């Protein structure tokens, strides 16, 4: 078990004394160490009679004895306060060593009054076995009263807002878009959950098109057939223009202004990180945007009309937009309780909306926490001129997602009024996204947030799994690289798939975000010493490290051929039985592919030295095929039996994370380190007619040519003599169209290479 603390802010001794005093620990530097220990235990919500101090004495006996307090005894007691079990989790007499091996913060100095006070201060900042830092656990046990006012410790807000007194309101915000050209601004339903307090509250907002319901049946009916032949394309240049939808002005009309919303709600999905912030004095707002249940408009799916329907909420919080108590617009309501400062949170589509909102430069959005977000929708459903489904969802496309999230049709009355217009616009979207060619076009350009990163004002916090093949790592990497030089940004890169990380045991993620949001949303100093990149190591249990950047400038080139004359060949076509088997279950195909049982060329490379990949690996291939159209798929494995982190978190303890005071209890989880025969490092796909994004070229049969394309970016450490397995093939039954033509691909390995960005030891 190893803990990684990134949320702890260094404080001088006077600051420590002042903060401890506010918690009720009022100590003098003239007290001896044992008196301070005794008072610490008396003031705490723990029962000191349960604690063991030495191999022979419990704490009560120790305090009565003449034995002096030393660091070993301190850690015997401290570990128990952190929920470690003496004689089982750790050995009495070896507590200091156990704490050091667990990476717990320690004072490496002699035992003095000042040092023991500092030790208790940092102990309160330390993670318990259950994943909560000690001070937050004790506050949840009643260390401070629920007075609905802010209390801070180590630059973090504590859970002193009463979750039993939360206000829950439903409002309709007037957006600056008319997504169906009705001649009226679309109204957007929002749900607000906020503490009952006289304080002016900041907002943690989650923009989720899923929030008010999804239409699974419409989604399934809209799925595209993947068993189709690749289209041959005429050579041409692609032209796009940068444009944004014009914002509409609201129609001014004087209305009565009320203080309270008549509509309330009781149930609904909430993000547990937002719940955590609720009890710490941050309001939560959930907004689903245009084309969703009880709102107006069409589900425009990723364009700036959808984004503006989300940022309208931030405008309302800052007095620049209007909100109403009902869709009838008879009464207006102001955000008089809000301080106007907003953070956006959420994973996947939710993180995507955060990226998009940030690129509008909307005033009041101070920071985004974009988890597994999409920065360019083309790169989610396409790759290098090829239709490429996101991992786990073959046949999905943006029109399918629109059908899923157009939740207005879930209400019968709205279905009657709006379905005909919806069907017309959905058909237009299907045509515009152009599955036939797979090329970039104006439709996708309008859904590319990367071209507007120069407008970003908010601080950017990125969370992404390097084993996420749904929303692939390039989405985070590209946004990271596109931000202007010097922009405030940090990335948390974990080894999981498409998952949240705010309830993991090994890292104080929620507390780190707490310190960041407190500074940005409550006008306090940002003293958090956060590195640019916080990386979970790929072959160690519960180890996180710091890096300077995502993407290295140094490269090495590994030739794919072992001799001067070296060729590889694979066929595209499968017999009917195999084709049907793989089409039915792409996981069967993936297993066969990784074990060299599919139609593929496999090149195994033994590494001559240790290296860390940092960025997108590039393939440079010399090849030919016996057709005038074709596509290439590539995957690279870390091949060979060894321990690696799984990409799915496992529960370590149930319902032990208290988000407030017995509020929204959450499971403690972690990625396990397990034996495995291989692990996917990266993969990529390309249409051989698309050597760059905006050019389509002719492909000549039986003629050699060279192509270069990047695979997904990653950071991955490999040891000397580790084996890289490079897999080259055509049809991928999870991602690409299932083209079963009889095409043979031949690769000149002697003229082909792997170009790897590598991390310097210094970084």
UniProtKB/Swiss-Prot annotation:
It comes from the Bacteria. Keywords: Aminopeptidase, Cytoplasm, Hydrolase, Protease, Serine protease. GO terms for molecular function: aminopeptidase activity; dipeptidyl-peptidase activity; serine-type peptidase activity. GO terms for cellular component: cytoplasm. One of its GO terms (biological process) is proteolysis. The active site is at residues 348, 468, 498. Its EC number is 3.4.14.11. SUPFAM superfamilies: alpha/beta-Hydrolases (SSF53474), Galactose-binding domain-like (SSF49785), X-Prolyl dipeptidyl aminopeptidase PepX, N-terminal domain (SSF81761). It is found in: Cytoplasm. Removes N-terminal dipeptides sequentially from polypeptides having unsubstituted N-termini provided that the penultimate residue is proline. This is Xaa-Pro dipeptidyl-peptidase.
């Amino acid at each position: 078990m190893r803990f990684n603390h990134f949320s702890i802010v260094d404080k001088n001794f006077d600051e420590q004394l002042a903060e401890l005093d506010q918690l009720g620990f009022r100590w003098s530097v003239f007290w001896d160490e044992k008196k301070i220990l005794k008072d610490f235990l008396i003031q705490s919500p723990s029962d000191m009679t349960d604690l063991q101090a030495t191999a022979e004495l419990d704490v009560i006996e120790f305090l009565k004895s003449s034995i002096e307090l030393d660091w070993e005894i301190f850690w015997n007691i401290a570990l128990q306060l952190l929920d470690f079990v003496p004689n089982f989790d750790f050995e009495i007499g070896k507590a200091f060593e156990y704490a050091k091996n667990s990476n717990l913060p320690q004072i490496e100095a002699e035992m003095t009054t000042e040092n023991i006070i500092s030790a208790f201060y940092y102990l309160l900042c330390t993670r318990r076995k259950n994943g909560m830092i000690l001070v937050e656990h004790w506050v949840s046990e009643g260390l401070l009263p629920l007075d609905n006012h802010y209390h801070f410790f180590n630059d973090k807000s504590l859970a002193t807002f009463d979750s039993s007194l939360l206000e829950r309101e439903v409002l309709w915000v007037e957006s600056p878009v008319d997504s169906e050209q009705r001649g009226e601004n679309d109204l957007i339903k929002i749900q607000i959950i906020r503490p009952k307090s006289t304080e002016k509250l900041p907002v943690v907002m989650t923009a989720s098109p899923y929030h008010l319901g999804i239409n699974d049946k419409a989604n399934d009916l809209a799925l595209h057939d993947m068993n189709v032949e690749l289209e041959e394309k005429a050579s041409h240049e692609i032209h796009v223009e940068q444009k944004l939808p014009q914002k509409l002005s609201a129609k001014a009309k004087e209305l009565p202004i009320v203080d309270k919303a008549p509509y309330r709600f009781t149930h609904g999905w909430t993000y547990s990180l937002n719940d955590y912030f609720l009890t710490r004095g941050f309001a939560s707002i959930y907004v689903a945007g245009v084309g969703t249940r009880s709102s107006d408009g069409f589900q425009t799916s990723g364009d700036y009309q959808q984004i503006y329907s989300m940022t309208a909420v931030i405008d309302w919080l800052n007095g620049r937009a209007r909100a109403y108590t009902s869709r009838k617009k008879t009464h207006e309501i102001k955000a008089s309780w809000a301080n106007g400062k907003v953070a956006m949170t959420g994973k996947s589509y939710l993180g995507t909306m955060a990226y998009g909102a940030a690129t509008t430069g909307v005033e009041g959005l101070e920071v985004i926490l974009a988890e597994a977000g999409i920065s360019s929708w083309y790169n989610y459903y396409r790759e290098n001129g090829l239709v490429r489904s996101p991992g786990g969802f073959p046949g999905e496309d943006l029109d399918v997602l629109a059908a899923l999230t157009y939740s207005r049709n879930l209400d019968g009355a709205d279905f009657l009024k709006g379905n005909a217009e919806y069907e017309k616009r959905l058909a237009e979207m299907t045509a515009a996204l152009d599955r036939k060619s797979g090329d970039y076009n104006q439709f996708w350009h309008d859904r590319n947030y990367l071209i507007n990163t120069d407008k970003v004002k908010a601080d950017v916090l990125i969370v992404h799994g390097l084993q996420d093949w749904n929303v692939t790592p390039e989405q985070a990497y590209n946004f990271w690289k596109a931000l202007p030089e010097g922009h405030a940004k940090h990335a948390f890169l974990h080894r999981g798939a498409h998952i949240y990380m705010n309830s993991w045991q090994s890292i104080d993620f929620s507390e780190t975000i707490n310190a960041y949001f407190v500074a940005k949303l409550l006008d306090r100093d940002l003293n958090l010493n956060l590195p640019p990149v916080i990386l979970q190591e790929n072959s160690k249990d519960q180890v996180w490290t710091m890096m300077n950047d995502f993407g290295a400038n140094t490269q090495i080139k590994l030739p794919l051929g072992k001799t001067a004359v070296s060729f590889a060949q694979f066929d595209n076509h499968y017999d009917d039985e195999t084709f049907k088997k793989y089409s039915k279950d792409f996981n069967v195909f993936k297993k066969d592919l990784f074990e060299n049982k599919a139609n593929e060329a496999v090149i195994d490379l033994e590494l001559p030295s240790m290296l860390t990949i940092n960025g997108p690996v590039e393939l440079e291939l010399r090849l030919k095929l016996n057709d005038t159209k074709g596509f290439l798929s590539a995957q690279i494995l870390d091949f060979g039996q060894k321990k690696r982190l799984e990409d799915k978190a496992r529960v370590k303890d149930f319902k032990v994370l208290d988000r407030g005071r017995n509020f929204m209890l959450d499971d403690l989880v972690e990625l396990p380190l397990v034996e495995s025969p291989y692990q996917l490092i990266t993969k990529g796909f390309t249409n051989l007619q698309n050597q760059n994004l905006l050019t389509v070229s002719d492909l000549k049969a039986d003629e050699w040519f060279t192509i270069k394309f990047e695979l997904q970016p990653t950071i991955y450490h490999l040891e000397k003599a580790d084996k890289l397995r490079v897999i080259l093939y055509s049809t991928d039954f999870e991602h690409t169209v299932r083209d079963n033509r009889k095409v043979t691909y031949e690769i000149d390995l002697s003229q082909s290479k792997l170009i790897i960005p590598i991390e310097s030891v210094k970084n």
